[in-house]
Amino acid sequence: INFATLSKFFAETLAVAEHILLRPAFPEEELRTYCAKRKQRLTIDRTKVDVEAREAFARALFGPQHPYGTSYDEAEYDRLTRADVVEFHRRRYTAENCFVVCSGRIGERERQAIAALAERIPHGGATVPAAFPAPVTEHEAFVGHPGAVQSSLRIGRLLFPRQHPDFLGMQVVATALGGYFGSRLMRNLREEHGYTYGVVAAMVNFEREGYFAVATQVGTDVTRAALQAIYDEIERLRTEPMPAEELEIVKNMMTGEMMRILDGPFGIADVTIENILCGTDNASIGENIRRIRAMTPADVQRLAQRYLAREELVTAVAGAADPRQA
């Protein structure tokens, strides 16, 4: 739950926070309106190849029975009751399951008021982490969408969460591939071939898992060519050392983005929350910058060779025609 306010309205905002945390009403009519809107939004989203590819990619990575690979349908909103929401709040919104992050102009008076509210959050025992099944990965997935003029592509693989020592290095690899406008995939797919308006590559972090992914949308007629271009760029990172000048640009992009995010109370709060959830603190920011600056072309090639072998990649496509049959 996030609250942002001007300092002069701190007391009024804290009163609203207290009501939401300690005495939520969950009015039946408002709940039904919310569910109807979310159901309609989901119905609309399911008509888009981008959403279909994203869900197919998650199922392929983790398996349909894994929490990270499960997709819910519109009927779930019809089954949700006010009693379900009240019970979820009672079990999950407890002192053992929460922490408070404050940023901005927070004085001693404000800090004490926030601490007093936090102390009033009911105790209920820490939630026992759910048992996750082992991921069951399929390497290819296709979702047919008759009449679609574009195909949505996802290529990647299951790797590791942020706590892994190679996560940051793989962020450098992903940035070089598709993390900024002048990245390799942008130059290849957009500037050289005109297959797409944009392509992105990133490392994605969950609490218990993490993965590497490339995502883009292309014209149906160039689906196979675009897939091959992505495979080729990944393979080029594995077989050819990256020029030092290019790597320096990548490093500057990453460290500059980190500084931009930290420029202000909202970004500082977001980074702090992520660090707490990942079991670290803000002291890791400086260490991460140091590690990024220390990356060499050999490091990039080594990581690409270790983690991005073609046979390990998962490919998901949503569109009018299955590229495997073309």
Residue ranges, per PLM feature:
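Charge-rich, well-structured scaffold segments of protease-associated domains
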Residues: I1-A126, F160-P161, G169, E191-A326
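His/Glu-based metal-binding/catalytic segments typifying zinc-dependent metallopeptidases
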Residues: G125-S183, V317
